[in-house]
UniProtKB/Swiss-Prot annotation:
GO terms of molecular function: magnesium ion binding; phosphoglucosamine mutase activity; phosphomannomutase activity
Description of post-translational modifications: Activated by phosphorylation.
Cofactor note: Binds 1 Mg(2+) ion per subunit.
The name this protein goes by in its record: Phosphoglucosamine mutase
One cellular-component annotation, GO: cytosol
Length: 451
């Protein structure tokens, strides 16, 4: 069996790659593996899902697998990924299961597992679960019978409990703020408008009528056009877009301009430093964050720590160093004082709280970061490792770094899943960034031609 878990759990085309049989196998293996630490009681699992039509099918398979392994299940229904993590911790469950493929198209789905406390699983535990699936394929576990079979409890007020938790974290009420929220026809459709209204905002909601088929369909954080238009039409101070499982938050100013995760992080970092809650005056971001963020934070006296690409690496750094804020340009923002994973609705609340507290517009607050023009070229290659480290490629990168100096940067990264090398260049002008990126891309193509 190849590697089953990717950077964000198990994902694939539902009922083709991610079948009910595979979902059941993952659930059984997870129940056995994650219950090993404490055999004094039957394991307890919290299970939630987003709005994809396939979620009901996969939920049934996962619940069957868990209960057949002796685990009791708290089924919470349609909720955001961070809500499932929160309820896993609140219920003192042994683990949590979220069925979602986040921002991916509707036909995809995924299985994301949380450890006790609502934290993402470490790589070594995922590897143990994979090994258990392989072992069970040839030697079946002894299954409990009678009273040993797990039971299922439906939690009906999970959404309300989660909303109250979110609103309780807000440092300043949102009275006077008018916001348009794009719920991506996903897991945020109920809780995001409810949380924003509860905190005092006037809310206009769009793409908040999921039908199982329309999740992420030309809406949400990856498709901002409808939100940008709605913000201007309704005269709102801002717009907020979530993705299918609501772990992302991307914003739009009153003029309809995008405010990305880098700018949101900068706004929150300054707010938290003023409040004395930005531990060590440090922000955690990935290497894909725009150089403009680093320049802005340096100017403001805030240290920026960079990690590999992926919110799991941001989370690891936050936990290891005891820091209070981190995230990605894509809108995954993590505030460990209030959540164990990226939480789009939490981020939206704190962003609007800053607007309300300062009386400034989102455009004014976002202006702390001036993003540098960025060019990204995905170069098809025969061997992505060779294409990234060939001497001629490295020489061209070094030449570019000297040319750009402190006013730009180069990031060369082999894709983790495709035969591509990603060439990213930031510079003072888009023309210069494109020229430099094309030169490097040409060297990559020469070093590792396709075919």
């Amino acid at each position: 069996m190849g590697r089953l878990f990717g950077t964000d759990g198990v994902r694939g085309r539902a009922n083709a790659d991610l079948t009910p049989e595979l979902a059941l196998a993952v659930a059984v293996a997870a129940a056995h593996t994650l219950a090993e630490a404490d055999r004094s009681h039957p394991p307890l699992a919290v299970v939630g899902r987003d709005t994809r039509a396939s979620g009901e099918m996969l939920e049934a398979a996962v619940v069957a697998g868990l209960t057949s392994a002796g685990a009791n299940v708290v089924r919470v229904g349609v909720l955001p990924t961070p809500a499932v993590a929160f309820l896993t911790a609140e219920a003192k469950a042994d683990f949590g299961v979220m069925l979602s493929a986040s921002h991916n198209p509707m036909p995809d789905n995924g299985i994301k597992l949380f450890a006790a406390g609502g934290h993402k699983l470490p790589d070594e535990i995922e590897m143990k679960i994979e090994a258990a699936i392989e072992a069970n394929a040839t030697t079946a576990w002894e299954r409990p019978v009678g009273a040993g079979v797990g039971r299922v409890h439906d939690l009906l007020d999970g959404a309300d409990h989660y909303v109250q938790h979110l609103v309780g974290t807000v440092p300043h009420r949102l009275d006077g703020i008018k916001v348009v929220v794009d719920c991506a026809n996903g897991a945020a459709a109920e809780v995001a408008p409810a949380a924003y209204r509860e905190a005092g905002a006037e809310v206009v909601e769009i793409h908040a009528k999921p039908d199982g088929l329309n999740i992420n369909d030309e809406c949400g954080s990856n498709h901002l056009a409808a939100l940008q238009q709605a913000v201007v039409e309704h005269g709102a101070q801002l717009g907020i877009a979530h993705d299918g499982d609501a772990d992302r938050c991307v914003a739009v100013s009153a003029d309809g301009d995008e405010v990305d995760g880098d700018q949101v992080m900068a706004i929150l970092a300054l707010a938290m430093r003023q409040a004395g809650t930005l531990t060590a005056d440090t922000l955690v971001a990935t290497v894909m964050s725009n150089l403009g963020l680093r320049i802005a934070m340096s100017r403001e006296g805030i240290r920026l720590v960079e990690t590999k690409v992926g919110d799991r690496y941001v989370l690891e750094e936050l936990r290891a160093s005891g820091l209070a804020l981190g995230g990605e340009q894509s809108g995954h923002i993590v505030m460990p004082a209030h959540a164990t994973t990226g939480d789009g609705v939490l981020t939206g609340l704190h962003l609007m709280s800053r607007l309300a507290a300062t009386g400034k517009s989102l455009a004014e607050l976002a202006a702390v970061v001036t993003p540098l023009p960025q060019v990204l070229i995905n170069v098809p290659v025969g061997d992505r490792t060779v294409g990234a480290v060939a001497p001629a490629v490295r020489a061209e990168v070094e030449r570019a770094e000297v040319e750009l100096g402190d006013a730009g940067r180069v990031l060369l990264r082999p894709s983790g899943t495709e035969p591509l090398v990603r060439v990213m260049v930031e510079a003072s002008t888009e023309t210069l960034a494109r020229q430099v990126a094309e030169r490097i891309a040409d060297q990559v193509r020469t070093a590792s031609p396709v075919g």
